[in-house]
A protein has these predicted regions:
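A structural-propensity feature for long, helix-poor, extended segments
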Residues: 129-157, 161
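Short glycine-rich or small-residue beta-strand-to-loop segments that form or flank ligand, phosphate
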Residues: 58-62, 90-101, 136-140
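Conserved active-site and cofactor/substrate-binding residues in soluble primary-metabolism enzymes
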Residues: 54, 70, 74, 105, ...
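Glycine-rich phosphate/diphosphate-binding loop of Rossmann-like nucleotide-binding domains
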Residues: 98-132, 136
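A structural signal for small-residue-enriched, beta-sheet-centric alpha/beta enzyme cores
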Residues: 137-138, 151, 167-270
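N-terminal amphipathic/basic leader segments beginning at the initiator methionine
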Residues: 1-53
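Gly/Ser/Thr-rich loops at beta-strand to alpha-helix junctions
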Residues: 96-104, 143, 170-174
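An N-terminal, well-structured beta->alpha segment
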Residues: 45-85
Length: 270
């Protein structure tokens, strides 16, 4: 069976299964333009799709050589609609993944481009006192740190006390068509590595005591063979660079709505 982190694909796979002749209960889906929203309403839907209860919004991206700004602006609006954050709610942005492995470096490279303000608000209140408090961390992976990412993020969250946590991670898709072309946003948290059979401790409200939102893009696809194999595009380095710019741009516009897109170039590499 193909593995996928995308709730939309999980729903499609369930509906296409020859064994499924009944209606999919506990799940609601609707489309609007380039957005598709899948709501897993209860335990029946969660069991059928193998995903936690919550909302999953997928946004289709244009070709990676298109305008980053437009994609970032669209993403910022989706984030606001999904989270409903108040103007002064503080946020901890977490870049999950292994920076040394290109298909898994989306999270760390995105955090590198996020405008972090917590230290600026404290150090330069006259200039940045009106900004939202945003902090960020890229906790690495268990194999290189010896510590679960969740444990490191929990320690950071206990110290900075954010209103919510926004996790960014590379995902796995079941279809080549969605590889590096679909952004999934969710209010149900995330279990890193689940799409490639290396599931780590889940980031959720239960484990971190604050709402956890997840945003990710599939950068690998299941090989679909008897051997454990995953595939990634030949130009994945360029794709990750583009995707991290889109995600960071959207996150920056969402967290700092009083800034224009070009304003962020003063502080971070956009």
């Amino acid at each position: 069976m193909l593995r996928t982190d995308l709730a939309l694909e999980a729903k499609e796979l369930w509906e296409k299964s020859a064994e499924r002749t009944t209606q999919l209960e506990g799940v609601r889906a609707r489309e609007q333009g380039n957005l598709t929203r899948v709501d897993i309403l209860d335990d029946r839907g969660a069991k059928a799709l193998g995903k936690p209860v919550g909302s999953y919004v997928t946004m289709e991206l244009p070709s990676f050589d298109r305008d980053v700004r437009k994609a970032a602006e669209d993403l910022a609006q989706v984030l606001q609609d999904l989270t409903g954050l108040e103007e002064k709610d503080s946020v901890l942005v977490v870049g999950l993944g292994n920076r040394a492995v290109t298909p898994d470096a989306l999270g760390p490279q995105t955090v590198d481009r996020v405008f972090l303000t917590r230290h600026l608000i404290r150090g330069l209140p006259d200039s940045f006192g009106s900004c939202r408090s945003v902090s960020g961390v890229a906790p690495g992976v268990l194999a290189t740190t010896g510590v679960e990412s969740l444990e490191l993020v929990r320690g950071a969250a206990e110290h900075v006390k954010p209103h919510c946590i926004l996790c960014v991670d590379a995902l796995a898709a079941g279809s080549m068509d969605r590889l590096c072309r679909t952004v999934q946003l969710s209010d149900a948290g995330i279990a890193p590595g689940s799409g490639v059979g290396n599931c780590r401790a889940a980031f959720s409200k239960d484990s971190l005591s604050v709402p956890v939102y997840a945003i990710g893009v599939p950068t690998v696809v299941d090989g679909g063979s008897d051997r454990p194999m995953i595939l990634t595009p030949r130009d994945i380095d360029e794709q990750i660079r583009y995707l991290s710019r889109v995600l960071a741009g959207g996150i920056n516009l969402f967290l700092h709505p009083n800034f224009a897109y070009d304003d962020f170039t003063q502080f971070v590499p956009m």
